[in-house]
Amino acid sequence: MPAIRLFDTAAGHEVLLESGDRPSMYVCGITPYDATHMGHAASYVAFDLLNRAWRDAGKDVDYVQNVTDVDDPLLERATATNVDWRDLAQSQIDLFQTDMEALNVLSPDHYVGAVESISLIVPQVERLVSQGLAYTVPGTNGEPDGDVYYDVEAAGKQSVAPDAWSLGSISGLSESEMLELFAERGGDPGRSGKRQALDPLLWRVARDGEPSWPGASLGDGRPGWHIECTVIAQKYLPAPFTVQGGGSDLIFPHHEMGAGHAYSLAGVPLARHYAHAGMVGLDGEKMSKSKGNLVLVSKLRAAGENPAAIRLAILAHHYRSDWSWTDEGFAAAKADLAAWRRALDHAPQGSAAALVEEMRAALAADLDAPAAVAAVSRWARQANDGGAPASAPDQALVRDAVDALLGVRL
């Protein structure tokens, strides 16, 4: 495997991943409801490619993924469907993991829930309060006192080191852009009593009808979204770890704020690099839970579709691109998969090594799966056109390499 280059969102350009012998990666996991839609699948397949590329290079990879197993959308769905939120979360986690296994996505070394991490999160929020980087907000309109918020302005001034975090370090967004996205993605810019509109929640004190946990000096409650990932990553990975991954909708506020929390707590960046997968639509429209147009992996599998074809349909698109799932694209992926499998019976002698090198070069160039897929398709056309009996060594090498590098089982 050549040296891997990856587009770093924070840097704004491709970078060479200098990860040593043990690269490390954290990919933000699902909030367990409506799993696993195609946007989820595309994101985890994308970072599975990086995991596979590193492993192909002979490296031991430390990979951590969380699951946001308590959060407002989950609680709202549980209430709407009259299901206990814990049962809903567990059923969706089980479904997600089954879907990932079907898609041949390598499992993380640590799959960590927010709930099980609360005892780790509480003292870290207390530290931020004691450092003067977090503060409590009085309740209004019947809300209780004591919600804890992160002071982004104070945090941005805590260090003048070249790698220090300040608001915008990861996203590169303007304040107006941040405010718009903050409101759309779970933030509360209009909350009374906050020092800055963009200050994110660290600890939500207990409310009637909501689950809560002991918070020591914070009072009973539950953690905010961003601090969960920060604490889990700092627990299980080195500081800084190699790559923080996720969908592009996580750049702001989630990854921006998580990076700030981490620097405030450890004095070093959370991650060396930030990489993000594009968004997936359906037939040209944004795919969203609110629109009810989610394409679910489990429903495709239940309809008898081959998970390898689903994965191949995803790999036809560069991981950073925004794209739409279409029947035509899926049909093309199924046709490609069939052609690849036929070609194994006609693998030309001496053809496999060059194909493997093409695939490796493509993945090393910012995980260019479409180029790798195109290389396999060219090889398959030549093999099928030739029609000769297969060379057993080439047949085996192609089958193993397509599985190891692209995660497509032939």
UniProtKB/Swiss-Prot annotation:
Transmembrane segments: none annotated. Pfam families: tRNA-synt_1e. It catalyses: 1D-myo-inositol 2-amino-2-deoxy-alpha-D-glucopyranoside + L-cysteine + ATP = 1D-myo-inositol 2-(L-cysteinylamino)-2-deoxy-alpha-D-glucopyranoside + AMP + diphosphate + H(+). A motif ('HIGH' region) lies at residues 30-40. Zn(2+) binds at residues 28, 229, 254. L-cysteinyl-5'-AMP binds at residues 28-31, 43, 66-68, 225, 247-249, 280. A motif ('ERGGDP' region) lies at residues 184-189. Binds 1 zinc ion per subunit. It comes from the Bacteria. InterPro entries: Cys-tRNA/MSH_ligase, Mycothiol_ligase_MshC, Rossmann-like_a/b/a_fold, tRNA-synt_1_cat_dom. Its EC number is 6.3.1.13. One of its GO terms (biological process) is cysteinyl-tRNA aminoacylation. Keywords: ATP-binding, Ligase, Metal-binding, Nucleotide-binding, Zinc. Coiled coil: none annotated. Its cofactor is Zn(2+). The keyword Zinc applies. GO terms for cellular component: cytosol. A motif ('KMSKS' region) lies at residues 286-290. Signal peptide: none annotated. One of its GO terms (molecular function) is ATP binding. Catalyzes the ATP-dependent condensation of GlcN-Ins and L-cysteine to form L-Cys-GlcN-Ins. Belongs to the class-I aminoacyl-tRNA synthetase family. MshC subfamily. This is L-cysteine:1D-myo-inositol 2-amino-2-deoxy-alpha-D-glucopyranoside ligase. The gene is mshC.
